[in-house]
Amino acid sequence: MASDSPHDQPVAGVSEIRGALVVRLTGELDLYNAPVLRETLLECAARSPRRLVVDLTEVTFVDSTVLGALVEVRSKLGSRDGLVLAAPGLETRRALEVSGLDRFFEITETLEDALGG
């Protein structure tokens, strides 16, 4: 039986804004929902967007499985500027810093900044 809890549905939406593909994530991102997140991000990357923005505004937690999926997607895009992590909260930012990935990704304070506004 499928569950519709936010834990199981990490992707809140995908939209195109000002030429960028924006993937809005929500809740706790971990081993249990990483496959859905990974699949969605890889599908978006396959569309070769000018910029793929991962909106982390509503994310409360990320684990190493999710960080690995983000690294994989960025590698598929081939450019550090092609994938932007927007508006990570304190816990998410801390996970990126502790893992050293804050130097691997472009990270912006807000979604608007990620969109070049």
Pin down the residues of each PLM region.
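Short alpha-helical segment
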Residues: 113-114
